[in-house]
Design a protein with these regions (language model features):
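Anion-binding and metal-coordination hotspots
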Residues: 1-240
Length: 240
């Protein structure tokens, strides 16, 4: 998996944690190099285990994947996630895609200098459909070299379901106080397991064995949480 820009040979452990009591609801061990295909399956499993129809999924940028986010939204979940940084062709951040405004009524983009980019073709990549927009005013623009290196002028791609991502972005911005709690909820458990419990690497091999080993450790974590919330006598009464 990816680790600080390099690739490490290791397993990738996913976890879903409830925000109220910080119990681990579900875990999954994968050998994927990143988290981008894990958002929906983890959120779906957690929702089913909690037997709830309402679920707010708070995830870090590593999980940002348009298809995964849309699956969550289609299932009635609320998703709070920061946008991943786009691969922009220009180093000048004043002309990154995020600085361009989309007008849904006219189906055009407006660039930071007020020029318009009109739709000119449909395209697809990795099974995802996009619309492409191009500016016809680049030739005489004094900011051209800061905006694009293409001889034909600046272009922008828009995914067919990008409006879903726009809505998720607005939802995340409006609930930034909730999003900020993510580290305390999820990162806390990994810090506890690694530092307090001293569990920093797996002893088993093969993914099914590692998954069982991780599950055992997280059961111990959940039990530790229980003991911090209830006395031994209270637990005995609850489970008797």
């Amino acid at each position: 998996m990816k680790n600080n820009g390099s690739l490490d040979i290791c397993y990738n452990v996913q976890s879903a944690v409830d925000a109220q009591n910080h119990f681990i609801i579900d875990i999954s061990t994968t050998n994927d190099i990143n988290d981008q295909n894990q958002l929906y399956v983890m959120a779906k499993d957690a929702t089913e285990l909690l037997n709830t129809e309402e679920c707010t999924v708070v995830a870090d940028t590593g999980y940002y994947n348009g298809t995964e986010i849309k699956k969550c939204i289609d299932d009635g979940m609320t998703v709070l996630i920061k946008k991943a940084k786009a691969n922009n062709s220009t180093k000048d951040n004043e002309f990154w895609k995020e600085k361009f405004t989309y007008d849904p009524e006219r189906d055009i983009y407006i660039c930071p200098t007020g020029q318009r980019l009109d739709f000119f073709e449909n395209t697809s990549k990795n099974g995802m459909k996009y619309k492409k927009y191009k500016c016809s005013s680049c030739a005489d623009c004094k900011y051209r070299n800061s905006c694009t290196s293409l001889k034909s002028g600046r272009t922008i791609q828009r995914w067919e379901h990008e409006s879903v991502l726009d809505a998720v972005y607005e939802e995340t911005q409006n609930n930034n106080n909730i999003y900020k709690q993510r580290r305390c909820i999820v990162e806390h458990l990994f810090g506890t397991v690694k530092r307090t419990l001293g569990y920093s690497f797996f002893l088993r091999r093969k993914i099914e064995n590692v998954d069982a080993e991780a599950a055992s450790m997280f059961i111990a974590y959940n039990f530790k949480r229980l003991l911090s919330m209830f006395s031994t006598q209270e637990l005995a009464e609850k489970f008797s």
